[in-house]
Amino acid sequence: MIINAKGPASFAEKYIVRSIWDNKFPPGSILPAERELSELIGVTRTTLREVLQRLARDGWLKIQHGKPTRVNNFWETSGLNILETIADLNPEGFPVLVDQLLSARTNVSAIYFRGALRYNPDTAVDVLAKIHQLEDTAESYAEFDYLLHHTLAFSSGNPLYVLILNGFKGLYSRVGRYYFTSSDARLLALNFYKELEVLAQAKNYLDVPALMRTYGMNSGKMWLQLRDDMPASIAQYN
């Protein structure tokens, strides 16, 4: 098992998570005793204890006082916060993970974009006004796209959408910086922003779902043209 880590705690965390992913520690199994596991990994018991607590908070493990630590089925117990970890664990499946991520974000964003234009159209107008000074670079587009989604999610009348979006942030930001290296992708996005701005100025939230659906289909086709050339390093979060 080859693990790149920045320190003992990072190494221990990646070792345990990789072992769970590879079914060395399968769901429902009991982790080795603390002393045995710390010797196996090569870290102090104090470091291991901190790592186990962190992994339990993320849903990988179940820790109960006086009982051995049990491995969870992370698909049932974890949240969006492990997306980055899954990408790092399974680089071969990363393009499919991104497909699923983009599909999920498109479906959810249609709801909060409509909500924002319905309940806070002036906020939508203000953030969309920034497109007229948007630099034609991948970095600028990726940053603005996240700003737009974050602002409209918060203004939709249901701030829980912001928490969902935050779960996508790190992974989506890296993918976005790659996606927007395409001038065609930037032009497609700019036209979408302009159409959305017109709807916001008119306080027309009813036509948002149709616009989102069209842009989702077109950007999905664009992504399929770009994803095979995506650098493998994008899957790595540290």
Curated annotation (Swiss-Prot):
UniProt keyword annotations, A-Z: Activator, Cytoplasm, DNA-binding, Fatty acid metabolism, Lipid metabolism, Repressor, Transcription, Transcription regulation
| CDD domains to which the protein is assigned, alphabetical | WHTH_GntR
The keyword Transcription regulation is assigned to this record: yes
Residues annotated as coiled-coil are none
One GO CC annotation: cytoplasm
* Residues of the DNA-binding region: 34-53
Q: Which residues form the HTH gntR-type domain?
A: 6-74
Question: What is the protein's major site of localization?
Answer: cytoplasm
* Role according to the record: Multifunctional regulator of fatty acid metabolism.
What is the protein's given name? Fatty acid metabolism regulator protein
Chain's gene name: fadR
